[in-house]
């Protein structure tokens, strides 16, 4: 039987049977689950391909217009029955302040991309040991959202029939949103449930809150998903219940991460353990 050596606490080398040494080495699955330093080129390629795949699948889901409008009418009636149908009032109130609604239109069109990428870059540079687990939570959240788009097509409030919601992008002729205006034919108009604006912004907010050191930065982390909720309602792109769907997807994403990594991202070491 072959032998290998280990170094004792006193610095002396001792022979260890090869079978024992082999048993102490992590297996392939354990090595995959162990946090490691991410490779920049691989992460750029992975994120680009993953987002392209997500967009392709999301927009390939059949636009079931009639069912999406029925589902929107049902949610709107249910909210009225429960006394929580505030979306139209918020939409009209914010639309009356031109500079505010124009800013919200651009916020809706851009920030969920920009800030999500910014948080990923920050994790990559400052928390490489937690990066992989946090990225897995984001990817799992986004993947399960695709199931929602397929199983529950939902029209946004601005596309409902017989209601007075204002399509703020059309009215104020702002650019950037693929949900309405000239770019609407490039995006699935009936993929409102769940809201990934909320799923992604809450992921960003919780990541910042749990990992940032400065108190004011942590507070900004919590304010970001709150502001996003106001924006998606004010622009009539979502019911607020769509935000609940996004939160449920994020909870699923964190559950996947907890199962795979054995801990949530913030509980993992900041720096990856050196591997063999």
PLM feature spans:
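N-terminal transmembrane-helix/juxtamembrane module of multi-pass inner/ER membrane proteins
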Residues: 2-114
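Alpha-helical transmembrane segments of integral membrane proteins
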Residues: 34, 38, 42, 46, ...
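Hydrophobic alpha-helical transmembrane segments
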Residues: 106-123, 197-205
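Interfacial helix-loop-helix junctions of multi-pass membrane proteins
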Residues: 154-163, 188-193, 227-253
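Aromatic-anchored segments of alpha-helical transmembrane domains
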Residues: 52, 56, 142-150, 223-234
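Membrane-interface loops
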Residues: 58, 65-77, 86, 124-217, ...
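Alpha-helical transmembrane spans of integral membrane proteins, capturing the lipid-embedded, hydrophobic core
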Residues: 43-55, 113, 117, 138, ...
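Hydrophobic transmembrane alpha-helices
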Residues: 205-209, 250-258
